[in-house]
Structure formats: C-alpha cells, structure tokens
Amino acid sequence: YRDMTVPYRAHYLTRTVEEVLQREKIPYTIYSGVQFFGRAEIKDALSYLRMIACQDDLSFLRIVNQPKRNIGERRRRLLQEQAAQEGCSLFTALRRSVGTEAFRGTGAARFVSLIDAFSSDCSGRSVSEVLSAILHESGYEAMLRTEGSQERLDNLAELKQSVYEYETTCGEECTLEHYLAHVALFTNADAGDSRDRVKLMTVHTAKGLEFPHVFLCAMNEGLFPSKKIRTLPAMEEERRLAFVAMTRAEQGLYLSEAAGRNFDGTDRYPSRFLL
C-alpha cells in the first residue's frame, strides 16, 4: 500500500475515498489534513443528528453551545450535577432548568424547542432533509458563513452528499437510526499502527514529491477545475495544478471521474483536463 498515493483538489473530497478504504480494510494516512469524519464540523453535524435520535450526553456536550448560546462550562457543570442527582440525561436536566434563574439570558429554551421539534417530526422526513434543516435552523451554517469558513462549509456539503448517496442505496429503509449506525463504522474505525498505508493528500501537498502509483480521483467539472474558478488566468493555474498532480507518478497514473448527480440534482461531467 505504501507505493499508492491519492492526491485530491480539496480536503472535503476525501470522504468517499475514506469510506471505501475503511470498508475494504485498507490502511491509509492523510498528510496535512484530518480524516473526514474526524473534522470538527462533521462531528458537530452528526452530534446534532444524534441529539435528534437519542439525546445522548456526549452529543449534548458537543453542540449545546455550538453556535454560542451562553451555556458555558459553569452552566454545563450545573447540568451535570443535576443530571447525576436526578438520574436523567443532560438534555432532560436542561429542559427542567429552562425557567430557572441560572439559565435566564441564554439560548437554552430555543435549543430545547429545536431538538424537541425535530425529534417529534423526523420520522416523516428523509435524513438528508433533517440534516439540511437542523444545520440551517440551529444557526450552525450561519455561524460558519459569518466566520468565513468556506472549507468547513464545503465539508458539510460533502456530508450532505454522503447522506444523499446512502439514501439512494437504501431506499425507503433509510431512517435516521440506520444512517447513524452506518456512519458509526467510519467514525470508530481503527487503522492500526502499520506504516504500510495508502497516502492521501492535497495536490498542493504533493508538489515536489513523486510516488510509484498515483490515483487522481474526482476529475469532474466543478471539482477539478474548481467551481470557484472565474477567470482565464485562474483556469490556467488549475491546468498547471492538474499537470503537477499527473506528473507525481513514477510508474502508474490512474485518472477517474464520477458519473451520476450531485446533491443539488445537477449532472456530473468529466473534467476538461481529461478530454
């Protein structure tokens, strides 16, 4: 495996590759990046889904103050003490504390109402619809836009794409619980300590390096070249970047593009760099 390298245009494109490698039990390592399901915004989004499905304490602690709801460490400690005394979940403790002095001036009531509303209504909605709605209505995506975190927003868009693909595969049997069980296989994956791993990295990271076998994937319009390209000079820079990626291979170069549709329903087309 150590002779194989998968360069990609942007970090969010690792999701599909990682899923396949994990499913096939092929060890890999990511250079200058974090595994897709280990990224903070992906963990946050999945924690919102878990809160809707089962309201577990770990997910609660992760997203109760994401975005900011003025429920800091001191208030979370109060909830943990109350939950221990009453033998209930942290979310139940918060629900019981909404009207108290300690939580006045916080977003506690709105957070409880948000989770309760989604929990009671999610059975009649697709998982992709629930995910898009909770990220919007919670204010999480708006927070990232305010921060100018485009890469994190791209990662969330890729997560939505993964949910859409899973729904397409499972059909009517795809419930929120089924999806969370499916994604747990990737979030809990253990790659072991072996150094014999496939290398994953961005094309920029690969500059100046060479590898026996290079697998350049996601060669689609809108991905490579990026959909953000608007000028001819920028397109020429993308072309040079594609050339850099292709010339990293010493023995074998494998180029691939993906057919089908994107999450927004648009068709996928091969990259102009393949034609």
Give the location of each predicted region.
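Short, surface-exposed connector motifs at secondary-structure boundaries
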Residues: Y1-D3
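Conserved helicase C-terminal RecA-like lobe
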Residues: H11-I26, R39, L46-L275
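Conserved RecA-like helicase motor-core motifs
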Residues: K25-Q35
